[in-house]
Swiss-Prot record:
NCBIfam families: pgm_1 (TIGR01258), PRK14115.1 (NF010713). This is 2,3-bisphosphoglycerate-dependent phosphoglycerate mutase. SUPFAM superfamilies: Phosphoglycerate mutase-like (SSF53254). One of its GO terms (biological process) is glycolytic process. InterPro entries: His_Pase_superF_clade-1, His_PPase_superfam, PG/BPGM_mutase_AS, Phosphogly_mut1. The gene is gpmA. The active site is at H9 (tele-phosphohistidine intermediate), E87 (proton donor/acceptor). It comes from Rhizorhabdus wittichii (strain DSM 6014 / CCUG 31198 / JCM 15750 / NBRC 105917 / EY 4224 / RW1) (Sphingomonas wittichii).
Amino acid sequence: MPTLVLIRHGQSAWNLENRFTGWWDVNLTDQGIAEAKAAGELMAAKGLDFDQCYTSFQTRAIKTLNIALEAMGRLWLPVEKDWRLNERHYGGLTGLNKAETAARHGDAQVKVWRRSFDIPPPVLEPGGEFDLSKDRRYAGIAIPSTESLKDTIARVLPYWEERIAPDLKAGKRVVISAHGNSLRALVKHLSHIPDDEITELEIPTGQPIVYELADDLTARDRYYLSER
């Protein structure tokens, strides 16, 4: 029976500052580092082990994975990084404080941008502070100017089918360290959560989510490791 573990990165600097982060690269806070270490220690204590690891191109997810693996004595495990596991791109909201954005645009509009399934935020204007077009890690990639959750799912699921699902079907134990919305995409797919419900699903930082899967990758169980 294949085992899959999902971990949202530990608290980041912009989580702490309540800013829209998206594709912008920010580091973990001390609390985020502690969350990642605790996740690794918990997985080791519960007897979890892995054969293959996946993460995004973003530092906060990569570091969370590395810190957790170090706590498990598994830094040597193979890791594949891919931009398709990145956080949802928040477009022109990137870098803005969420409370200030609500004061400027109104709570209702900000809720639409944050929590609707298929309505993206305003686009990120090219050439600005948060333009990633010259970031070498994204060379050859068509960087989005904004994304809805639906857009995020549209890039995450092909990667799942192409790379991750075959590993699980081959019997490999897999851990994915990623982001709130890229993980929502996977949870929606695996647990068949409707469009209007997935936007309300909260995924806390640094908490391993365990999926016990049938051989055809249908979900038999989903739970937070800390609760079992």
